[in-house]
Amino acid sequence: MGAKKHTLQVLPWLLLFAQHTAASACDCANTTDGADRQGAMKLKLIAIASILAAGAAGVLVPVIGRSMAALRPDGDIFFAVKAFAAGVILATGMVHILPAAFDALTSPCLKRGGGDRNPFPFAGLVSMSAAVSTMVVDSLAAGYYHRSQFRKARPVDNINVHKHAGDERAEHAQHINAHTHGGHTHSHGDIVVCGSPEEGSVAESIRHKVVSQVLELGILVHSVIIGVSLGASVRPSTIRPLVGALSFHQFFEGVGLGGCIVQANFKVRATVIMAIFFSLTAPVGIVLGIAISSSYNVHSSTAFVVEGVFNSASAGILIYMSLVDLLATDFNNPKLQINTKLQLMAYLALFLGAGLMSMLAIWA
């Protein structure tokens, strides 16, 4: 009787375990439950237009806004916009992309050795490697820009006056090299450009150029993955909530990237190219997903590995850029530190950006 009672107690747990195991097995199959290719195609076309418009609007807000006095790169409102954008980018890396990378690389659908041992956290390793690599690229690129600027900035030599024989020529040479103005004497030496006040602004411009280019690289990588995943789906129930969520996602990321582009002071042509690349990447990814949807199996081992590795690398890049190149730089700015009101506004914008982007993870 006791054994029978014990069996009855254990039976529900066995049924739950069997149900969970079956669900896991089904997740790895390329099922077509809820598939509606025609309905999904309509939603994909809407997604292409919506995400394209949202991304373009986001990146153009800071670019167009720099012509307005309130949104100048050195203005208080722009500080708040940058803090908001940095929060968005940080949440994108930590809340959206990195968890997805861990899910992909620890999926039960992947064949791995080692029995029941815990799988190695490859997502964390790839993310860390990408962050360190970003730091190396950041440093090397900044060094390259500095060296190129130094080669362009040649010191201006003073007029060399050679001393010739004769007291008159010596006195004349001394007169050229030294002038007396109102009781003080100064002599003219070489004009060294690196000691000029413009050096700081040149260094800042170099840093912003590097930051914006590396940041765009990280954003482009995961935008392609997002687009392909959406384009390859054949379930309208999966696509429908993603349309709005990814539109907001692209808009907020565009604001962050646009702010960096504005600070870098790129030429008009470079600014337009970077804005177009960002705006088109996710829609192009959707088109690629549509093209391969008939043969692409999102539940295959290859798909999990590729998606996991690229998401991990993208997360590492975005987390590094948001913390080191955006937040640390701006929040250590003396202008921010001596202005309590601006500090509070920047912190509020940071938490608002990170919070809103994190909320989107409910739907995306």
UniProtKB/Swiss-Prot annotation:
Its main location: membrane. InterPro entries: ZIP, Zn/Fe_permease_fun/pln. Induction: By zinc deficiency in shoots. Glycans are attached at N30. The keyword RNA-binding does not apply. Expressed in vascular bundles of stems. It is a multi-pass membrane protein. It is found in: Cell membrane. GO terms for molecular function: zinc ion transmembrane transporter activity. GO terms for biological process: zinc ion transmembrane transport; zinc ion transport. Residues 1-23 form the signal peptide. Residues 24-44, 98-119, 235-241, 293-303 are extracellular. It comes from the Eukaryota. GO terms for cellular component: plasma membrane. Keywords: Cell membrane, Glycoprotein, Ion transport, Membrane, Signal, Transmembrane, Transmembrane helix, Transport, Zinc, Zinc transport. The chain crosses the membrane at residues 45-65, 77-97, 120-140, 214-234, 242-262, 272-292, 304-324, 344-364. Zinc transporter that may mediate zinc uptake from the rhizosphere. Seems specific to zinc ions and may not transport other divalent cations. Belongs to the ZIP transporter (TC 2.A.5) family. This is Zinc transporter 3. It comes from Oryza sativa subsp. japonica (Rice).
